[in-house]
């Protein structure tokens, strides 16, 4: 596991020489201001893309790791992460996680301060559903984007309205999601 900005051609070449064949790269978020001010990661999107291009050109297989559902995050910010992923070339896998408010982290404290999370709750493992109660982005909305994130990144823009309908956990949303999931499996596995 690494951050994109920590990779340069010289270091990557040295790791390849000793047997590196795969990298897992933590992008986490595509909105520069959110990444800088909330996640405390300063590299610009342009810098990250430059470093990801070095990895893509090396021939090393790599995956991109993303997180959604952060405290104060909006739907628009999540879609900036999706759009940023659409710019990255050469990856062979994407992972998407939902933010987990781990004890002792600044982000957990932010969630508590904003009344998105109960200070008495303890989380000891990653979650498959958002634990935050944000008025501007519900757990169900986060879960819907979570289940369609890979489709938003990989599919052509003409399918975006259908993907948005697949976010919904209704019978229609589930039916559309299943059709799109089957198409995703056919194309990418």
Protein language model regions, located:
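C-terminal non-catalytic accessory extensions
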Residues: 170-189
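A structural motif corresponding to the C-terminal lobe/cap of the Radical SAM core domain
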Residues: 1-171
């Amino acid at each position: 596991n690494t951050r994109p900005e920590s990779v340069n051609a010289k270091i990557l070449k040295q790791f390849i020489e000793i047997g590196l064949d795969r990298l897992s790269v933590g992008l986490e978020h595509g909105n520069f201001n959110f990444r800088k001010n909330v996640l405390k990661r300063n590299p610009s999107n342009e810098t990250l893309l430059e470093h990801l291009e070095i990895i893509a050109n090396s021939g090393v297989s790599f995956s991109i790791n993303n997180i959604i559902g952060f405290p104060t995050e909006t739907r628009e910010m999540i879609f900036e992460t999706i759009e940023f992923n659409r710019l990255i070339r050469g990856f062979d896998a994407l992972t998407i996680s939902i933010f987990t408010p781990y004890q002792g982290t600044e982000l957990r404290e932010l969630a508590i301060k904003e009344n998105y999370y109960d200070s008495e709750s303890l989380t000891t493992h990653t979650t498959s559903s958002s634990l935050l109660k944000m008025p501007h982005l519900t757990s169900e909305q986060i879960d819907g984007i979570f289940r369609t994130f890979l489709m938003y990144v990989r599919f052509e823009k003409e399918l975006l309205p259908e993907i948005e309908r697949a976010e919904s956990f209704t019978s229609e949303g589930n039916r559309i999601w299943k059709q799109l999931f089957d198409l995703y499996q056919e194309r990418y596995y």
